[in-house]
Amino acid sequence: VRYISPPVIIGFTAGIGVIIWVGQWKEFFGLPVLPEGHFHQKLWVLLQSFSDINPAVTAVALVSLALVVVPKWLPYRLGRIPGPLLALVVMTLLQAVSGFEWLPTIGSAYGDIPRALPAFQGLSWEYARWFELLGPAVAIAMLGSIESLLSASVADRMAGTRHNPNSELFGQGLANIFSPLFGGFAATGAIARTATNIRSGGSTPVAGIVHAVTLILIVLVLAPYASHVPLATLAAILFVVAWNMSEVPHALALFRRAPRFDTLTLLITFTLTVFVDLIVAVCAGVLLSRLHLIPWLKANKNTNT
């Protein structure tokens, strides 16, 4: 992962940003469709349904979007209030008081949030099953590790920090060992959540602790209120997340100043991320970066000899 070049990182983060952005059109505009399939298929279904936009839901989404963005222009102390938190609190309280039936919420779409921590599940002692799952488990562990380190690399670019890959993977592995004992599944570092954290000012490990404690409080105390969160508000927040991840100004600057090969690498990585798969995109981007270095390495070797 340390050999992934900046054009590759910008390409796949921009690609993920586009996927997130398009994936929220349904909730943002209140579209009465359920897009499925590959990205281009979902995009086509969504574009065809734009004649059925729900104006009321869209208005809620636009107000939420304004609440997310506005704190950036407020005076210093007020400006430190995270926009996503402000939008969530205001719009959730509004929905809880008004009870708009036409506005989809977490509760109406997915049901009530269970108000209890997961129970201990124990281990299965069927050793034949262990060997059967060994291959998939190794594959999931490898892919999860790659995704987490990619997420950490993106975080380093955004926050100007430097992560410790050994600590990251040790902590993730420890969590994934104990999570299944309580009915959980393998987790990784997520680029979207990481970008949201950093843009909201959370660039230290404390942000992860606050995230975990907040989830526990939501499950045990705030579940009835969380059920009133409008999906349009979540879509508005993810619109901003997608924009921040895409790093449009940085990408445009790269197009103007970078060598053509770097621009080509960015475009290929971006396209493969959106239309194929993240892992394929990163592998292709890294391969292109290495191929670009071969002539330089040969010339350097000849110079030294």
Regions picked out by a protein language model, each given a short descriptive name:
Residues 1-304:
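Transmembrane helical cores of multi-pass ion-transport proteins
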